[in-house]
Amino acid sequence: MEDFDALFAVNVRTPFFLVQRLMPIMCRGSSIVLVSSPAAHAALGTLSAYAATKGAIDTLVKHFAAALGERGIRVNAVAPGVVPTDMSSFAKTADGRDFALGIQALKRMAQPDDIGAVVAFLASDDARWITGDTVRVDGGSKL
């Protein structure tokens, strides 16, 4: 129960209330980029609570985009695939790496810059006509 509540506190409550607080002070043309996960759209056994939090983010993105669109504020999310960081320590093991590579079309592990480049794009004026969307940045996993 504690882990479940902690996941929702970090992954849903925090971005929800942060965006709520920022809404009144955001300028026209601003952009919000939240973090989702491909896990929101896959049945991955023990990750059901985590997946539910990321599904909630995908829904919040749509609601926030609708609420802020009149003010010219865009809201999107990225859904990163497996990046070998402390958050996905399993990917640092041979079995975890084999699993991650096995589900990706591009057959390499993502690096933080792979994800950061998409976040930068979504936050930029180059993405001025994109809102309410979650962009998968996962190397083509589960194609």
Residue ranges and their predicted role:
Residues 3-5, 100:
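Substrate-binding pocket helix/loop in short-chain dehydrogenase/reductase
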Residues 19, 53:
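Active-site helix of classical SDR
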Residues 24-25, 66-70, 128:
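Alpha-helical segment proximal to the catalytic Tyr-Lys
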Residues 29, 42-48, 70-71, 107, ...:
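Active-site loop immediately N-terminal to the catalytic Tyr-X3-Lys motif
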Residues 37:
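Residue(s) in the substrate-gating loop at a strand-loop-helix junction
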Residues 42, 120, 131-143:
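Short C-terminal tail/terminal secondary-structure segment
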Residues 104-115:
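A conserved structural motif in NAD(P)-dependent oxidoreductases
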